[in-house]
Structure formats: structure tokens, C-alpha cells
């Protein structure tokens, strides 16, 4: 079932799924499948994804894709089981730097352990 939300006169929101990345191609493909599934469910929002390391696209690529679609505010969701160093420090650092450089508003969500 798709979730369709329309909010008139609100900034255009998008969703960025943040992954760690892997050198294992099958792991990367599984993560890409997660992003595709979310795109199908969140039909009212542009959805993209990126990896912190070891795989493409990187987080900045996903953010650029969302900006190119007119997104003004991003909800970045770490798709990690635990809020370890990457989820607590590295991903927020990339997001904060990108936001400071471009002015894009980015809210950072909780790791999957909190759900």
C-alpha cells in the first residue's frame, strides 16, 4: 500500500536512505532493493539513497538527486541496525557539511534500533 501525503504550500520534502556501503555487490544490491521498495511506498515524496563508504552512489549523490527534483527539506534515515560511530558521527558530518554548503535543510532520523 502506498502512502500519499500532499501538503500545499509546504517545502517539498524528500527522503534519503543512508547506508554504510559494502564491497560485496550482493549487499549493495539488497540495499538498493530497500530504496526501491520505499520509493514505491512513499509516492508523495522523492526518495533516494547513498552510501557512506565502499559503494556508489555516495550520500552526496543522493542529496544532489533530491535537490535536482526540487526538494527543499530532506529526512535522512540511517538504515543501520545500531547507532554506532558511523550513524552517530560520520553520516551526520556528511549531512551537516552538505547542508552548510548548499543551504538544503536536512533532518536526521533515528537508527533502526529505535524503531
Question: Where are the regions a protein language model picked out?
Answer:
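Short glycine-rich or small-residue beta-strand-to-loop segments that form or flank ligand, phosphate
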Residues: 15-21, 48-50, 74-81, 107-109
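N-terminal glycine-rich anion-binding loop in soluble enzyme alpha/beta folds
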Residues: 2-62
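Conserved small/polar residues in nucleotide/adenosyl-binding loops
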Residues: 113-115
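Conserved phosphate/oxyanion-binding catalytic-loop motifs
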Residues: 74-101
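Short, well-structured alpha-helical segments in soluble
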Residues: 61-69
